[in-house]
Amino acid sequence: MTQPNNYKIGTNVIHAGQSADKNTGAVIVPISLSTTFLQPSPGVLHSEYDYSRSGNPTRKAFEECIAACENAKYALSFASGLATLTTITHLLKSGDEVISIDDVYGGTRRYFTRVAANFDLKFSFVDLSTLDDLKNAFTDKTRLVWIETPTNPLLKVADIKAVADYVHSRGATLVVDNTFMSPYFQNPLDLGADIVMHSVTKYINGHSDCVMGVLATNNDELYAKLKFLQNSIGAVPSPFDCFLALRGLKTLHVRMEAHQKNAFAICNFLEKHPKVERVIYPGLPSHPQHEICKRQMKGYGGMVVFFVKGSIDQSRSFLENIKLFALAESLGGVESLIELPSVMTHASVPAEERAKLGISDTLIRLSVGIEDINDLLADISQALDKC
């Protein structure tokens, strides 16, 4: 369990869960690659570790750091964001029902509908920008509510506190995927969520060189169940990946401010461009849930969505002519990324569902990096001129 402290997140990302190595004095947490640990006598542990799937010193340091950043008692890390999702889903039993926000990451929807549904779990996808659809979807069998806020890719925002209050009144558990905001800009546990999770691959690691996931909670019972599942399922990250994530985490506060600064500048440019139909960003007053954003977030992040005028031909032309923005899936790295969700991250979502959600062929998603803003704006401008 992580002990609470009074430090700000900019201090916790550097120090929480970490101390100088007792043997060498090294100020950086070592990469503990050993798969097994010495027992001085049969069944007697030399330390808290016996086998690296069950527990690892490098992994523990990362988990304690995340817990401190999310104002949580506990954190558990996994081999990917989807491994985190899979482990959480194992809290359920046959016949249980799950409500998910409709505009959810394509991989999450794919797992829910094409994998977990085969184990007699029922999933419904609803718009959670208001509580009406949530209340209508709830049944006596609803055990879990899963939200992303902001969502991927349309950046819709749910009122975490309002959702948590209703979910708890019905005896269910609320999970919030906080990947887009990171612990720096949003802390869902403080707003009533039972579990917060992240794809560490994104902003927490921040360097596009590590695939990992993590969850945090303040609930003792949930932690005990999830810790058992972490060990039993075994979808744990390698010590080296934990080291990379811990290293990336140290600059989270600096990076997130830079992402946000560049995102605002790009939004201001796009809103005035004649070839852009619409811009979506939580920090813009035009965002439908901007007031909720101001209430529950400390900032607005680096994800920007905009619609080009025309058809998929204009989208393809723009994306083929962009230079600094890498045309690639994923997000949250220091480098700027760009993608077309309808044929990339959300291609697994049926076309009729994409149309219903508003994920059109002219919707372009930006993961705004921390490069020089003038270079990024010049790149966007020249690509738009050619589409």
From Swiss-Prot:
It is found in: Cytoplasm. Pathway: Amino-acid biosynthesis; L-cysteine biosynthesis; L-cysteine from L-homocysteine and L-serine: step 2/2. GO terms for cellular component: cytoplasm. Its main location: cytoplasm. The keyword Nucleus does not apply. Substrate binds at residues 53, 105, 110, 329. The keyword Amino-acid biosynthesis applies. It is an enzyme of class 4 (lyase). It catalyses: L,L-cystathionine + H2O = 2-oxobutanoate + L-cysteine + NH4(+); L-cysteine + H2O = hydrogen sulfide + pyruvate + NH4(+) + H(+); L-homocysteine + H2O = 2-oxobutanoate + hydrogen sulfide + NH4(+) + H(+); L-homoserine = 2-oxobutanoate + NH4(+). It comes from the Eukaryota. SUPFAM superfamilies: PLP-dependent transferases (SSF53383). Disulfide bonds: none annotated. Belongs to the trans-sulfuration enzymes family. Catalyzes the last step in the trans-sulfuration pathway from L-methionine to L-cysteine in a pyridoxal-5'-phosphate (PLP)-dependent manner, which consists on cleaving the L,L-cystathionine molecule into L-cysteine, ammonia and 2-oxobutanoate. Part of the L-cysteine derived from the trans-sulfuration pathway is utilized for biosynthesis of the ubiquitous antioxidant glutathione. Homotetramer. Interacts with CALM in a calcium-dependent manner. This is Cystathionine gamma-lyase.
